[in-house]
């Protein structure tokens, strides 16, 4: 069986991968210089993401879109946050958050799926295997585990 990928194509692909990795490292180094603690080379942060000093970003975390992470947050490991605001002191552990606003000092996860238009107030806990969509959670609300809450206030 012949190799159907030319040497020139492989060289071009390697060049693109090297450029992408250099851009990723530049973004990580900018955040580290601003006081963000980044725990791993497996972290991916999009250019438009804002992270306050003192936040901790753990291994396997992906931050995309217009995401804002507050001071003192712990994000990860293995967390995806896209187009969302995470206020100060919030922990998001091994979860996914899309188009939502997590208030201060929340505890999210593990394995929680926060879908669009979820808004949490101070001190909310969304436990293991919780899924939310288009819902508001008042100060101190707790959802322990294995729960779906959607289209509610």
Predicted regions and their residues:
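Terminal amphipathic alpha-helical/low-complexity segments used for targeting or macromolecular assembly
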Residues: 1-54, 60, 105
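Structural signal for interior beta-strand "rungs" in well-ordered beta-sheet cores
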Residues: 37-153
């Amino acid at each position: 069986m012949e190799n159907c990928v030319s040497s020139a194509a492989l060289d071009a692909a390697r060049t693109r991968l090297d450029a992408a990795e250099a851009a990723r490292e530049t973004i990580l180094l900018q955040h580290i210089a601003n006081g963000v603690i980044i725990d791993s080379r497996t972290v991916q942060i999009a250019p438009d993401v804002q992270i306050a000093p003192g936040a901790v970003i753990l291994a396997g975390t992906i931050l995309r879109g217009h995401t804002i992470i507050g001071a003192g947050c712990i994000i990860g490991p293995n967390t995806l946050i896209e187009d969302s605001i995470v206020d100060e002191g919030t922990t998001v552990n091994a979860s996914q958050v899309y188009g939502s606003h997590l208030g201060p000092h929340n505890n999210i996860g593990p394995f929680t799926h926060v879908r669009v238009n979820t808004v949490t107030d101070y001190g909310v806990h969304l436990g293991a295997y919780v899924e939310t969509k288009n819902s508001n959670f008042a100060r101190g609300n707790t959802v322990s585990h294995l729960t779906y809450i959607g289209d509610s206030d």
